[in-house]
């Protein structure tokens, strides 16, 4: 098993397959993507070697992220490869959802279990203002397609000062009938967005108090679950999650490692630098990658130090997909 010096075990790999994205979300890539081309990112054989090494060390869940992972022409191949790797029991992906109506059934057939979709507002104008794309209706049709074909669906929504007041009531009315988990995520500070963070960051604690007053009850976490505190209500088809990285003890339950699209291992979303694995992966020797991973895990810190204002090497969230 992969275990660090603080006794945390890592069952969960977040694998970024591209940094490119065709949305321009205010909290991520407000000016659009202007990074390296696709040949800068790991190839299918390199991803295969990586997955085999992680699986051998006890990784049972893999999430494919970006950027927007579906922009890779070989995304379906990556998905099938991940799902067919012995030891990988659960495959998830994070997407903006604009291509989901067309492809959800194909993803399911390739081995996908869960999809997380970013929806920061149910108001079309707000959605377009936040994302730079007038695609809310297409995304919502995609959600229906994902549910219809049996995928486990979660919706991610970033807490922002500008858009918070009317959003909650609209989302709650939506959750009455929608069997999805809606997770509100505190805005995280990244290297490129200090001013935006200072203006827009909102703690999730008041929202948690509001939900508890309304009768929402906490759920027990699964072994391979993410960092969300999840809540249910008997009158609602959907659930609500809160992801609050600035809260006390957030890092104690850390169970995931990250690999960026260019093949760097990030021991934390906010670590000072990634550890380059590309040459090792190109060699194709799974045993060597296993030894490397066991060796470097001792470098993982106890916490992300976000509360001290440190943002590490993450310039924007498209680099690692959260």
Region spans (language model):
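Glycine-centered loop/turn positions within well-structured domains
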Residues: 23, 124-125, 249, 275
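A short acidic, helix-capping loop that chelates divalent metal ions and anchors anionic groups
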Residues: 33-37, 101, 123-130, 191-195, ...
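Conserved, mostly hydrophobic/aromatic
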Residues: 17, 25, 64, 117, ...
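Radical SAM/AdoMet-radical enzyme domain recognition
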Residues: 44-64, 68-185
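Canonical Radical SAM [4Fe-4S] cluster-binding loop centered on the CxxxCxxC motif
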Residues: 5-45, 269
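Auxiliary Fe-S-binding modules of radical SAM enzymes
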Residues: 1-13, 173, 177, 187-322
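Residues that scaffold the ATP/ADP-binding catalytic core of kinase and kinase-like folds
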Residues: 24, 28, 72, 125, ...
